Structure formats: C-alpha cells, structure tokens
C-alpha cells in the first residue's frame, strides 16, 4: 500500500482527489496538508466528508514527507507548486502537480502566468500527464504536470486529427464551456448565483493561460510549423462539466464515417475515451462524475471544416481523475484502478 499526501487540501481539485482515492485499492491517503487551515478538521468545511476524513489538516514539512510518503498530489495555486515540487527532485517521491506551474516553457510561463518560472532542472524532469498520448514518458517520470481542463478536452479531440494530417495546423478555433467549479472555490462577483444563473459569460478572451498549453502540445504532433489556436472560454450555469467544440480546416477530402473510424483506431487501447457513433454527439451530463472523455465529430463539406466536440468532467478527467490515472501508469497498475465507476446520471 502506497502512502499519499495532498498539499493544498481544501480546493475543489483536492476534495475530488479525496473522494476518488477512497476507492483506490493501492493508495492510502495519509496526510492532507493546508498551510491556511492546518489544525482544522476538513469536515468542518466540507460536511460531506464527515466520518471519512477524521484527521486534522497538517502543516507542510518537506523532510517529513520525503521520509514517510510515496505519492504527493500538489493541489496548490499557480506559483506555489513549483517550489514544493523542486524539493522532491532528488527523492523517490512520485509527484503530480495539478497547477499550471510545470506545463509551459520558462518564457511562456512568465508571459502567460506573470510569475517567476520553475527551474530548468525541474522542467526537464517533468512529464506532461495527458495519459492517453504521453503514456511512455509518464512511465519513466517521477514528476508529472497534470494537464489543464480545457487542454485535456481540446488535445484529446485534436491530436489524432493533426497526427493523421486530417486538419490544418492553422485556423483552429476552440469554443470552450465550463461549469462554475472550473472557476475554483473562492467566490467572486462573477461566480455569485445571481450572476451565473441563467447566464453565459465569455472570459479571459485572448489571455487564457490554457492557450499556450494547447498550442505547445499540439505543435509536437505536426512537422512543418507551430500550431496556433483561438480559444474562447465561457462560464455556464452548472456545477461541473466541460465541453470543447472545435472547428478546424480540413487538409484532405474525408467523410465523417472515416473520421469516426480513425478516432476509434487511435484510442482503441484507451480505457477512458468513448467515441460517439456518426450523428451522435457528447454531452456533459454523460460524463459527470467520471474519468471519461466523450468525443464526437462531423465533416462539414459545405465549409470544408471538421467539427469536433469533446466532453469531460472538469474535476475528474480535467483534474483529479487524470492525476490518479497517471499515478496508476507510473506504478504499472491498470490505468482504470480506482477509477472504474459509471458517470452520475441523471
């Protein structure tokens, strides 16, 4: 049994990790660490955890973690995780960072996050944790940068099409929509019920930190040039769920049926990718509470565009679920371990 710690234990991503780890047969959640609420009981903030999490939250002590813990999940804000992860470079700890600290190059991170980047030594030893695509690199790494929620949905939909030269690398447009939990636990005027109810709001147009992340990892799958995308994200009035609908110029003449077959072949060994039949499209309700990514596609001959829809639960496949999937791969366990549950419906 491996012992795990969650650092930053009071955010939505951490709370989802706690829920999912409860059913993992090989991991014991030994420590929940919160610098702002250490000494407090987690079920005082989250009553749904009553009788399950009985230990008080603890302060961060790096050396104690190195001596006692096998797995660390970093659920801290951007700017914090990179400092903690660097402490584990020379240890045997397996570290999964759910923030954006280790996803980008130093220059891109500084530009998009407006913070000092991680060290090059740390970035060089970090693997990007899009499990279905980078599994071999994940197996060899001890530090994993868990993908963002929008990049997870967008990359899983676009990479197979770019790799097979179905779409152009320029002119890709991504329409992203996420539930309110995607904005995090801390409330603001933009996330109040009276603001979000019966309302759809675009945000961070042209400035979203997931733009360079999507471009970086798409560009690794084309030969001639770097990929540029337009991403517009929207906050919608539901608790959880994320949908990316993508529009990409076609590079070759192809039918929808052939596109569907290509997706099925590309992901035939992937436990958590479900490809919709021709004429059927994903919805967020169909993946709620699960680690699935549902993908549907349509070839629009009239406009010479491929339209791709990709749905995930932003807190599971877009965060905690993918983190556990990566830990499973790192340890040689079946990637479905602790994640074999159906979506919540209705």
UniProtKB/Swiss-Prot annotation:
Organism annotation: Oceanobacillus iheyensis (strain DSM 14371 / CIP 107618 / JCM 11309 / KCTC 3954 / HTE831)
Function per UniProt: Catalyzes the NADPH-dependent reduction of N-acetyl-5-glutamyl phosphate to yield N-acetyl-L-glutamate 5-semialdehyde.
E.C. number(s) listed in UniProt: 1.2.1.38
Protein's GO biological process: L-arginine biosynthetic process
NCBIfam families: argC (TIGR01850)
GO terms under cellular component: cytoplasm
Catalytic reaction annotation: N-acetyl-L-glutamate 5-semialdehyde + phosphate + NADP(+) = N-acetyl-L-glutamyl 5-phosphate + NADPH + H(+)
Functional pathway: Amino-acid biosynthesis; L-arginine biosynthesis; N(2)-acetyl-L-ornithine from L-glutamate: step 3/4
Alphabetical list of SMART domains matching this protein: Semialdhyde_dh
Cross-referenced HAMAP family: ArgC_type1
SUPFAM superfamilies, sorted: Glyceraldehyde-3-phosphate dehydrogenase-like, C-terminal domain (SSF55347), NAD(P)-binding Rossmann-fold domains (SSF51735)
Protein name: N-acetyl-gamma-glutamyl-phosphate reductase
Active-site residues from the entry: 149
Family listed: Belongs to the NAGSA dehydrogenase family. Type 1 subfamily.
MF annotations from Gene Ontology: N-acetyl-gamma-glutamyl-phosphate reductase activity; NAD binding; NADP+ binding
Gene this chain is encoded by: argC
Compartments it resides in: Cytoplasm
UniProt xrefs under InterPro entries: AGPR_AS, AGPR_type-1, NAD(P)-bd_dom_sf, NAGSA_dehydrogenase, Semialdehyde_DH_NAD-bd
